[in-house]
């Protein structure tokens, strides 16, 4: 079995920044987070400065795959913080991540830090998933016993994004958006699943609002945020939302137009600095649907298995909330 121990010996992506502080290149994030992100001497980013909550999770069982690890850790960390009475979980289900936040696995251990979604997206990196002992090539999670469709919290207005706004986006981007995603953006841009949504084939926990169209520069504006994500994707892909553990993207140019892909952070396969960006995305992106409608059809809304697993982890003492480092200072 090929395990994550390979990742421990591999040079992390962007290891050239080892021992340095990487600052946010765009004005919105640079203003919000002027301290940037320090990359340690081994090439792993240290996001602890931005941690709003921290959880520790027990070692995974023998034979666990990377998608199982990622999903189990996220829902267990959420449940542990919800059980602790953390204020961010006042308005979301126990297994969901608060909007605007994502979990980062600190390298070399089983510590998870809750950091702003736009901070973790700064650069390609390795962390505690790439350095874990799980099978990095075993994909997917256990099949669900039954699936219910996902529902979105839609705006009270007739549409979330107007046709005029969509045309403005297309003018800025230089191409027409693929049809299925275009329809979703108009109906539900900026909306999040009610509770959680799960793509069991990839173990994707989807609990964040999708990108929308804003009148001003913002980290949830479709055009602006894609300018911030060029370390992750080529211009053949348009990022459409943050999911736990990475980005969701739509193919907007070339073969497979309109198809949906998962771009994972902390990917143990991302080890060759000689790969050109186009080669890297071709090798690393994981398919999530032939078009956006197919992607939505793969999702299960609020599967009870998530809560069952998370409760077992918390009640058994395998997932627990721990104090946030005293130096953490979000958004200074």
Show which residues each predicted segment covers.
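Short, surface-exposed beta-strand/loop "edge" segments at domain boundaries and coil↔beta transitions
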Residues: 63-65, 141, 246-249, 267-276
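A surface-exposed partner-binding patch
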Residues: 145-247, 322-331
């Amino acid at each position: 079995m090929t395990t994550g121990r390979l990742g421990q010996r591999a040079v992390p992506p962007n290891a050239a920044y080892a021992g340095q502080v990487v600052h946010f290149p765009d004005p919105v994030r640079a203003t919000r987070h002027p301290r940037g992100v320090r990359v340690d001497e081994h090439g792993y980013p240290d996001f602890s400065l931005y941690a709003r909550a921290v959880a520790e999770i027990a070692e995974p069982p023998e034979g666990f795959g990377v998608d199982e690890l990622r999903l189990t850790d996220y829902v267990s960390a959420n449940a542990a913080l919800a059980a602790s009475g953390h204020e961010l979980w006042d308005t979301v289900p126990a297994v969901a991540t608060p909007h605007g936040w994502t979990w980062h696995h600190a390298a070399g251990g089983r510590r998870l830090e809750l950091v702003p979604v736009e901070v973790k997206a700064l650069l390609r990196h390795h962390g505690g998933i790439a350095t874990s002992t799980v099978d990095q090539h075993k994909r997917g999670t256990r099949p669900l016993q039954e699936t219910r469709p996902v529902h979105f919290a839609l705006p009270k207005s007739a549409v979330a994004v107007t046709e005029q706004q969509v045309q403005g986006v297309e003018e800025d981007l230089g191409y027409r958006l693929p049809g299925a995603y275009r329809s979703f953006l108009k109906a539900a841009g900026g909306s999040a699943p009610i509770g959680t949504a799960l793509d069991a084939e990839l173990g994707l926990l989807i609990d964040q609002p999708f990108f929308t169209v804003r009148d001003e520069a913002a980290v949830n504006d479709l055009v602006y945020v894609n300018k911030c994500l060029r370390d992750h994707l080529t211009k053949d892909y348009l990022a459409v939302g943050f999911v736990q553990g990475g980005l969701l993207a739509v193919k907007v140019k070339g073969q497979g137009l309109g198809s949906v892909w998962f771009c994972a952070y902390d990917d143990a396969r991302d080890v060759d600095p000689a790969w050109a960006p186009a080669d890297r995305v071709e090798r690393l992106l994981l398919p999530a649907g032939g078009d956006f409608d197919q992607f939505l059809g793969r999702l299960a809304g609020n599967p009870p298995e998530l809560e069952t697993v998370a409760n077992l982890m918390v009640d058994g003492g395998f997932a627990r909330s721990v104090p946030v480092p005293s130096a953490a200072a979000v958004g200074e």
